[in-house]
From Swiss-Prot:
It comes from the Eukaryota. Heterohexadecamer of 8 large chains and 8 small chains; disulfide-linked. The disulfide link is formed within the large subunit homodimers. The active site is at 175 (proton acceptor), 294 (proton acceptor). The gene is rbcL. This is Ribulose bisphosphate carboxylase large chain. It is found in: Plastid. Its EC number is 4.1.1.39.
Length: 481
């Protein structure tokens, strides 16, 4: 008998394939406070029992593989394996189940969103035994959360830096997103900031193209910021997109922005990657820059209800990786966003402690301990008539960002900014006086337009613009109470 055979025999090795559920389905397991918990929406192939499908997810995202291997005997699988500890049927959906999986904390590198996702979703989504798989939610335990630095500054520090309190912040994405020269781009930034906005923004795909190189854009935007600040007496900012082809180039652009003295930069965290995003967040923290995060590419990952990763998971990952703002849908605009689901992950971004609430799609209680919060950004197809609803839905700790809803004003950029600022101030004042924004919103806007010709013109242009499409991502029947 060879030494290798003797070793295999001594550890009880028996070659062959066995059902995952024999090892990885553990319905009597009691989860630990240090476990990372995951809720997967599982659609098994015909003939695959849900217990086997859930166990396969736990195995393939932790220690398991398709066959028994003799090296299993060289470690403690009970210590390191993922466990499918509960399965529930999704009512109203054919052959769909929620499989709950617990992962020991030792499986993950400290402070690495990249490693966390590589482990949990890196390979299992291509598994043939599953027709579809979606990661609905994660419970990040405090023991793991404390290994991350999170947002560079957080909500309160940002308000103190900007000296802006008691209302949502106002922004605008410069349009057209591509094709403007750096000088004309800077002119649009100046007009919007002078009109009353707090921020303007590079769009997600504005990087460094032949028609407008990044350095030229940074310089003209900085000039616009300082000029508008001098004229209005308010602190202004422009989200300078530092996203680049390499981490080194990204940090070089961030350093140039810091040298210009601007307050905020921007990153596309999904296309740029979590490693790059975490590196940039660390740089922003050390150098006093706020970090705006765009979620470009998110719908490729989160749009389908039965496959992918829900945005609430991507939002949690961003809070760990680091960002002071992140786009979060609008509920009322042109982009996907069901109200209760959106409010659920907005709370997960901002609050320190969020209770489990299936009526809002929150599968686990989440304790962020001391990790700073992130401002949700409402952006996409919104205009002045949406202002009461946006103020009511998102509250003060948010950024309301109007692109076409500013630049599409018939009188130009600055009047468009004035219209939005007047509408916001009117809604905040009405709310503070006890009016119901949901019920009285239209009358509040009409009354304010009586003394603001800029708002009156905006109201006339967008009075019939609506986006009446149902959300693809909706609550399950067993979540609706």
């Amino acid at each position: 008998m060879s030494p290798q055979t003797e070793t295999k025999t001594s550890v009880g090795f028996k070659a062959g394939v066995k059902d995952y559920k024999l090892t990885y389905y553990t319905p009597y397991y009691e989860t630990k406070a240090t476990d990372i918990l995951a809720a997967f929406r599982v659609t098994p192939q015909p003939g695959v029992p849900p217990e086997e499908a859930g166990a396969a997810v736990a195995a393939e995202s932790s220690t398991g593989t398709w066959t028994t291997v003799w090296t299993d005997g060289l470690t403690s699988l009970d210590r390191y394996k993922g466990r499918c500890y509960h399965i529930e049927r999704v009512f109203g959906e054919k052959d769909q189940y929620i499989a709950y999986v617990a992962y020991p904390l030792d499986l993950f590198e400290e402070g690495s969103v990249t490693n966390m996702f590589t482990s949990i979703v890196g390979n299992v989504f291509g598994f043939k035994a599953l027709r579809a798989l979606r990661l609905e939610d994660l419970r990040i335990p405090p023991a793991y959360t404390k290994t991350f630095k999170g947002p560079p500054h957080g909500i309160q520090v940002e308000r103190d830096k900007l000296n802006k309190y008691g209302r949502p912040l106002l922004g605008c994405t410069i349009k057209p997103k591509l094709g403007l020269s750096a000088k004309n781009y800077g002119r649009a930034v100046y007009e919007c900031l002078r009109g009353g906005l707090d921020f303007t923004k590079d769009d997600e795909n504005v990087n460094s193209q032949p028609f407008m190189r990044w350095r030229d854009r940074f310089l003209f935007c900085a000039e616009a910021i300082y000029k508008s600040q001098a004229e209005t007496g308010e602190i202004k900012g422009h989200y300078l997109n530092a996203t680049a082809g390499t981490c080194e180039e990204m940090l070089r652009r961030a350093y140039f922005a810091k040298e210009l003295g601007v307050p905020i930069i921007m990153h596309d965290y999904l296309t740029g990657g979590f490693t790059a995003n975490t590196s940039l967040a660390h740089f922003c923290r050390e150098n006093g820059l706020l970090l705006h995060i765009h979620r470009a590419m998110h719908a490729v990952i989160d749009r389908q209800k039965n496959h992918g990763i829900h945005f609430r998971v991507l939002a949690k990952a961003l809070r760990l990786s680091g960002g002071d703002h992140i786009h979060a849908g609008t509920v009322v605009g042109k982009l996907e966003g069901e109200r209760e689901i959106t409010l659920g992950f907005v709370d997960l971004l901002r609050d320190n402690f969020v209770e489990k609430d299936r009526s809002r799609g929150i599968y686990f209680t989440q304790d962020w301990v001391s990790l700073p919060g992130v401002l949700p950004v409402a952006s996409g197809g919104i205009h002045v008539w949406h202002m009461p609803a946006l103020t009511d839905i998102f509250g003060d700790d948010s950024v309301l960002q109007f692109g076409g809803g500013t630049l599409g004003h018939p009188w130009g950029n600055a009047p468009g900014a004035v219209a939005n600022r007047v509408a916001l101030e009117a809604c905040v004042q009405a709310r503070n006086e006890g009016l119901d924004l949901a019920q009285d919103g239209n009358s509040i806007i009409r009354q304010a337009s009586n003394w603001s010709p800029e708002l009156a013109a905006a109201c006339e242009v967008w009075k019939e613009i609506q986006f009446n499409f149902k959300s693809v991502d909706t609550l399950d029947l067993n979540e609706i109470k």
